[in-house]
């Protein structure tokens, strides 16, 4: 069982950790053993984390995309499932233009563009629900089977059950990742700036398409 925080278009290391829990057994019949994933649903919202931001590779280098949330009496005191996306601000067209500019030359961008943007354009009220829809989308496109459930109460690190691999607080934009991130893959601007690791999983998907899973599993 893997315990993770919700994240907006999460980084590659997030999916590499899930892929470690997902096994393929080859014999006369291919059988799938889904990853068991539990999302932290009882924590309070934390600013400057992957909960509402992701990192992409743009023409000028690595760029942060931040999803605005509604500030109601201090977001850090609100449970994560109560955080609302601020749809009153006209940020979505700008974010979509930024993604198009960064990835329109990627081999698989046009293949995934409309289906990915349709999730954003559905404008779910809650951040947690939007992130969950995006997570399921990326898992499906990468071919990772996962059974997802949610915490029903908050447990401090070190207090979880022995069979739970607790990665809360490990995957963070302000700290270098200590997790397996897979092997380098082709990126549009690598010739100019070099390979950039642990970007949003959409960077991997747009560049590697159906081969994305092979880049994070060995």
Model-predicted segments: where are they?
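Residues lining hydrophobic/aromatic ligand-binding pockets adjacent to catalytic sites
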Residues: 1-218
């Amino acid at each position: 069982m893997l315990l993770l925080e919700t994240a907006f278009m999460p980084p590659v290391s997030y999916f590499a950790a899930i892929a470690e829990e997902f096994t393929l057994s080859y014999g006369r019949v291919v059988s799938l053993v889904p990853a068991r994933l539990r999302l932290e649903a009882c924590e309070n919202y934390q600013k400057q984390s992957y909960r509402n931001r992701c990192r992409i590779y743009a023409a000028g280098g690595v760029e942060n995309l931040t999803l605005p949330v509604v500030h109601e009496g201090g977001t850090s005191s609100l449970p994560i499932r109560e955080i609302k996306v601020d749809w009153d601000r006209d940020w979505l067209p700008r974010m979509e233009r930024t993604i198009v500019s960064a990835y329109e030359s990627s081999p698989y961008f046009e293949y995934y563009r409309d289906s990915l943007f349709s999730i954003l354009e559905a404008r779910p009220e809650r951040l947690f629900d939007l992130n969950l829809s995006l997570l399921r989308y990326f898992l499906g496109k990468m071919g990772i089977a996962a059974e997802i459930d949610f915490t029903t109460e908050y447990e401090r690190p070190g207090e979880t059950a022995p069979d739970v691999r607790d990665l809360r607080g490990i995957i963070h934009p302000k700290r270098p990742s200590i997790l397996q991130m897979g092997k380098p893959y082709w990126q549009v601007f690598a010739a100019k700036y070099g390979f950039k690791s642990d970007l949003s999983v959409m960077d991997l998907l747009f560049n590697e398409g159906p081969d994305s899973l092979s880049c994070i599993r060995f």
